[in-house]
Amino acid sequence: DFTAGNGTGGESIYGAKDXXXXXXXTGPGILSMANAGPGTNG
């Protein structure tokens, strides 16, 4: 985000809040996760 600069802000430089990511799964059973640190819920 560019409002807080640490992942807790509400605006993205890419536009909409839920913009599509460019990562693709490579096969069945693949799980992708993100985490910004303890107590951040992703």
UniProtKB/Swiss-Prot annotation:
Catalysis performed (reactions): [protein]-peptidylproline (omega=180) = [protein]-peptidylproline (omega=0)
Domain PPIase cyclophilin-type residues, every copy: 1-42
GO cellular component terms listed in the entry, alphabetical order: cytoplasm
InterPro entries according to UniProt: Cyclophilin-like_dom_sf (IPR029000), Cyclophilin-type_PPIase_dom (IPR002130)
Major localization listed first in the record, in broad terms: cytoplasm
Entry keywords, A to Z: Allergen, Cytoplasm, Isomerase, Rotamase
Subcellular compartments: Cytoplasm
Highest rank taxon of the organism: Eukaryota
GO molecular function: peptidyl-prolyl cis-trans isomerase activity
UniProt enzyme class: isomerase
Residue span of region Disordered: 1-20
Regulation: Binds cyclosporin A (CsA). CsA mediates some of its effects via an inhibitory action on PPIase. Do not bind FK506.
Biased composition (Gly residues): 1-12
Listed EC numbers: 5.2.1.8
Function (record text): PPIases accelerate the folding of proteins. It catalyzes the cis-trans isomerization of proline imidic peptide bonds in oligopeptides.
Family statement drawn from the similarity comment of this UniProt entry: Belongs to the cyclophilin-type PPIase family.
Protein name (record): Peptidyl-prolyl cis-trans isomerase
